Amino acid sequence: GAIAEQVSPEEVRLKVNLILQQHRNIRKILKLDLTREANFPTLTCVCSVDASLTIRECHQIASQLENQIEKALHHLGRVTVILKPSKQNRN
């Protein structure tokens, strides 16, 4: 059966939070949006990352996280991870 299993939004948020928090470059999860698009759940995450990361690194990390989330939650139609460099410096 190709029926998409129903996963509660709470469970999605929990799993996504875990995946994002495990990544060393993620500073803070700013937004987690779960919407339905053409009957597919669509997830958008906005996270702050270290300001020292290059744009290329941000893209690589975002793709990596999107893949991880898609693997963990097969029922999601689309996963988008947006990384925003955080202005705060550590020093």
Kindly label every feature range from the protein language model:
Residues G1-N91:
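Alpha-helical transmembrane segments and adjacent TM-loop junctions that form the membrane-embedded core
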